[in-house]
Regions:
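Perimembrane helix-loop-helix junctions
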Residues: 229-244, 262-303
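Multi-pass, polyprenyl lipid-linked donor-dependent membrane glycosyltransferases
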Residues: 103, 167-177, 190, 194-230, ...
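Signature aromatic-anchored transmembrane alpha helix within multi-pass, membrane-resident enzymes
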Residues: 75-79, 248, 269, 291-295, ...
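Membrane-interface helix-loop-helix junctions at transmembrane boundaries of multi-pass membrane enzymes
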Residues: 237-240, 275-290, 369-390, 403, ...
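Membrane-lumen/periplasm interface segments of multi-pass, membrane-embedded glycan/lipid transferases
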Residues: 20-36, 129-137, 283-287, 306, ...
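Hydrophobic/aromatic-rich transmembrane helices and adjacent perimembrane loops
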Residues: 108-109, 209-210, 216, 256, ...
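Hydrophobic, aromatic-rich transmembrane alpha-helices
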Residues: 49, 174-180, 269-272, 278, ...
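Transmembrane alpha-helix segments characteristic
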Residues: 5-8, 76-88, 200, 267, ...
Length: 681
């Protein structure tokens, strides 16, 4: 494992493999980390030497501190959990405006509110394409989110009190308590266990993720419950109930992120099965309890899938994107085919990012854990379990096609327990090189021959870690917080508050999106499969696509036939460029040297006057205002579906980054005249 972390965490393999994923930022980031490590290491060596000269009674003091921690373990962990909760809440408000910002978060909150209303899906609108969104499934008149039901079910607890944003801070704080309970059972040194718990609670990767709406946080909570149940199950006093807790934890994690749960449930099952079949132990009860615990959530998941997708083993993302979304080396929903080489690139990029995002320290974040794993002479059974589960997790994402970068390499979030545990163990592992503590005995100060240098090394390493953390807290963390606070500005706008301030009620609000978003929505309206729509949009000249859609729409050509009619546009992929300054949209690809017709130029000019995003408006709570995508003359369908309402156009008055959308009152008669004129062209 240490060798893997050294190779994948320090070498830019992705940059050495032609094509595919890469880490273009590696040189700059590596230079910064190397500089920070040099400063921390140099200072740490000086501190380690000086501390050795003034060291007095350190062994006894550590023994006293360890005993004090052990006596009041629950108080220490409880304090960390409460403090972490307050920190997560504060970061959620300051960094993310207590709102879901990524499309994954938005759609899971939409599904959570459907669940909170007592439904698994809602009926489609008469013209659903005005209300469509990426990751929102529209199947046979049913509308629901693409994600496994467990994540939205966790958020639904917050929906019941109009506070989805509080769910992850609560679950993150509970995870701190669970990790504290777990690590105290598997780590004999109280000080090391407390340090690991503190790192788990306060690692910036954990803080930012716990302040978000992402489903990785509740997944880790249930994984930890499964691990606590597992440790109790394999103890001499393990009972059927412990196995049930273990199974429920892994089973509920599977209802949120099935691959993450499988990675840690599979080795747990093997461990329990081995104990049940052992000639000396024959512990069958925990195995049966775990089997029942896993089965109950999975049966519930299968029933929900049956009621939504129509098949117990089919998920919403398979309905939306096809089998290309699944694990394996094959074609993907969009982009190149996923191959083992691309899998290696992704895993490498994940671990290179972890070097910064895990602790935001002055040096590489994975270095202490790597050193501890390399120097450790023996592993406990739980250590082996945790490492096997971690390897399986990495293996699953090696076979997955998507990068999924957000707030760090989020797919690696379940590695947090093993990484913080081995980071915290490094000082003890170094001490074990010259005392008997490697067997879990308390330090006695009795050194082995030839180990006089090890105490200084240990002090220098410990000082380096502390200095690196302090430097990171003073430099990297504020920069990361500023980065998150300044990102995704347009998704933070509160439609309900703005509408109430403007006195807008019982209105039909037409939301002006970019030309590119309109083109994608029009393909969805024609029934073009989502993966085909993404592929075509990423390749086609937007004007040619617009004209092609204009020919298909009145002809009533839909579904596979529409996708086939648009397929020749894929040949555009080698020609267009992305002149964002000329279009206002970085996703539009214009063909150089081509003179566009007036209608296409008008679309470009409309882009330049400002546009906004539709998906966040799916979360507007004011029920009497209807927010629908603006699709030009097709909006006349909305006027028939929702008669008697005041009509507004929602768009910013400027294309400046962060410009708030503005409600513009529209006259229905003028709109109808404009649409009739457009239809006669």
């Amino acid at each position: 494992m240490a060798a893997f972390l050294l190779v994948f965490g320090l070498l830019p393999l992705a940059n050495w493999i032609p094509g595919g994923h890469s880490a273009p930022w590696f040189g700059v980031v590596a230079a910064d980390l190397l500089t920070g490590l040099s400063v921390a290491l140099g200072t740490g060596i000086v501190v380690g030497i000086l501390a050795g000269k003034i060291r007095s009674g350190a062994v006894g003091a550590r023994l006293d501190l360890s005993a004090a921690i052990e006596r009041r373990w629950a108080v220490w962990v409880g304090g960390l959990a409460l403090g972490a909760f307050g920190l997560y809440v504060l970061v959620s408000i300051t960094a993310f405006s207590a709102r879901p910002l990524l499309i994954d978060e938005i759609i899971q909150v939409v599904q959570a509110r459907i669940l909170a209303a007592g439904k698994l899906w809602v009926p489609a609108e008469p013209h659903q394409f005005f209300f469509s969104s990426m990751h929102l499934v529209e199947q046979e008149g049913r509308v629901y989110g693409q994600f496994p039901i467990g994540g939205p079910a966790m958020l639904a607890l917050g929906s019941l009190v109009r506070g989805e944003w509080l769910v992850n801070p609560v679950f993150g704080a509970l995870s701190v308590g669970l990790f504290g309970a777990l690590v105290r059972r598997v780590e004999p040194r109280a000080g090391t266990a407390l340090l690991a718990t503190g790192l788990f609670a306060l690692a910036p990767f954990a803080v930012f993720m716990s302040a978000s709406h992402m489903n990785h946080v509740p997944t880790l909570l249930w994984l930890l419950i499964g691990m606590v149940g597992l440790v109790r199950s394999v103890s001499p006093s393990g009972r059927w109930l412990d196995g049930l807790v273990c199974g429920l934890g892994f089973g509920l994690a599977a209802t949120i992120r099935p691959a993450d749960a499988m990675a840690f449930a599979a080795p747990a099952g093997v461990w329990l099965l081995a104990r049940a079949g052992s000639r000396t132990e024959r512990r069958v009860g925990p195995l049966l309890g775990a089997g029942l615990g896993v089965a109950l959530p999975l049966l519930a998941l299968a029933w929900v899938n049956l009621e939504t997708t129509g098949a117990p083993l089919r998920f919403g993302y398979t309905v939306l994107w096809g089998r290309a979304h699944d694990l394996g080396f094959h074609g993907t929903p969009w982009g190149p085919t996923h191959t083992p080489a691309r899998g290696i690139e992704l895993i490498n990029v994940f671990f290179l990012r972890l070097q910064s995002y895990l602790f935001e320290a002055a040096g590489p974040s994975l270095l202490p854990a790597t050193a501890a794993l390399a120097l450790a002479r023996r592993l406990t059974p739980f250590d082996r379990y945790l490492l096997v589960g971690s390897v399986l997790l990495v293996g699953f994402y090696f076979a997955y096609w998507h990068d999924g970068f957000y707030l760090g390499p989020r797919f690696m979030y379940p590695l947090l327990p093993v990484l913080v545990l081995w980071t915290a163990r490094l000082p003890a592992v170094l001490e074990a090189r010259h005392t008997r503590t490697e067997r879990g005995e308390p330090p006695t100060g009795e050194s082995r021959p030839g180990s006089a240098l090890w105490p200084t090394v240990r002090r220098a390493v410990l000082a380096t870690i502390v200095i690196g953390a302090v430097l990171g807290l003073a430099t990297s963390v504020p920069l990361r917080l500023s980065q998150y606070r300044g990102g995704l500005i347009s998704l933070r706008w509160n439609a309900d508050r703005a509408a109430a301030h403007s006195g807008i009620t019982n209105a039909l609000v037409l939301v002006r999106e970019s030309w590119g978003a309109e083109l994608v929505a029009r393909m969805w309206a024609l029934g073009v499969p989502r993966s085909d729509a993404e592929t075509i949009y990423r390749a086609a000249d937007p004007c040619r696509l617009d004209l092609s859609l204009g020919a298909l729409e009145p002809a009533g050509i839909r579904g596979a036939a529409a996708a086939a009619a648009l397929e020749p546009l894929l040949a555009d992929s080698t020609r267009p460029a992305q002149p964002e300054a000329a279009t206002g949209d970085p996703t539009l690809r214009l063909t150089p040297g081509v003179t566009y017709p007036p209608d296409c130029n008008a679309k470009i000019q409309a882009n330049l006057t400002g546009f906004t995003l539709y998906p966040p408006l799916l979360l507007a709570r004011q029920p009497d205002n209807i927010y629908a995508r603006d699709l030009g003359a097709r909006d006349s369908l909305l006027l028939r579906d929702y008669p008697g309402r005041a009509i507004y156009l929602l768009k910013p008055d400027s294309r400046a980054v962060g410009a708030d959308p503005v409600f513009h009152r529209l006259d229905p008669d003028s709109l109808l005249r404009e649409w009739r004129g457009a239809s006669r062209k």
